[in-house]
Amino acid sequence: MSGAGTATAVWGASDLRVSYGHVVALDGVSLTAPAGQVTAVVGGDGAGKSTLLRCLAGAMSPGRGQVRRPAKERTGYLPASSGIYPDLTVAENLDFRAQGYGMSRQLAAQRSAEYLDRAGLAPAAGRLAGQLSGGMRQKLAVIAAMLHQPELIVLDEPTTGVDPVSRSGLWWLIARAAAEGCAIVLATTYLDEAERCTSVLVLDAGIALASGTPAEIVAAMPGSLRSSQQRPDGDAFARSWRRAGRWRTWDPDPGPGAGDGQAIEPDLQDAVTVAALARQLRAGEF
């Protein structure tokens, strides 16, 4: 991809604030997206993931802060809606997107053939996009965002709702684009996917709770965790959650009398959960 020639480029955003009326969607959020790396943005519904990605892609402007991105024609964007036209064939969808990118017919045909082959969609080139499976449609949407070989690709939950085999195929496409020098920012609700990324930004209610490599986020988790089969009582219940058939409890100030249960080492899923609990604790919500 052409992004390989910009291996030192670092895209991203600084101190973004976005409001929808009286609702603050992002408040002081920053992110870096170096070339050749995959950056994950994680968080629950309403965390601000899509708003941040729209700002990065140039689809909207923040009320405050700066966005560093290549020119719009050097940016690829997959919105949550996918942007695929169901009444066009697979090939026609790519041709339509290529025209929007200003690609010549010859280059468009060459790239379409290349990316259809990468995605395993070449046999389906003549099928209507509306007749594809969910996984195939997402593959089409992802390669449409990659077709012009941009320097920055922004993907809003590209693997949500697809089968495990299609998820694996989508990640192969994403990893290859990064290996070829493209900077990739993606939103995901799957923390196992975030663990594969170079860096992770954790959002909650428009606020950045944590950022860094997956290992750095885990290492920075405050307090300690314990696991038990029994439901925690009292104040500990507000700091507990179920996972893999057991209760996990976060102790902000661990000590000899922290509580019952077995001490465990956290992973990224635990660290993200604790980051949200720590914010609630600071806000006096429990």
Locate each region found by the language model.
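The feature captures the beta-strand-to-loop junction immediately N-terminal to the Walker
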Residues: 42-44
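Helix-to-loop junction immediately C-terminal to a conserved catalytic motif
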Residues: 57
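Conserved ABC ATPase "signature" region
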Residues: 95, 99, 106-124
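Conserved ABC ATPase signature
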Residues: 128-135
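ABC ATPase C-loop
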Residues: 146-147
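Catalytic Walker B motif of ABC-type/P-loop ATPase nucleotide-binding domains
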Residues: 153-157
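ABC transporter nucleotide-binding domain
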Residues: 169-250
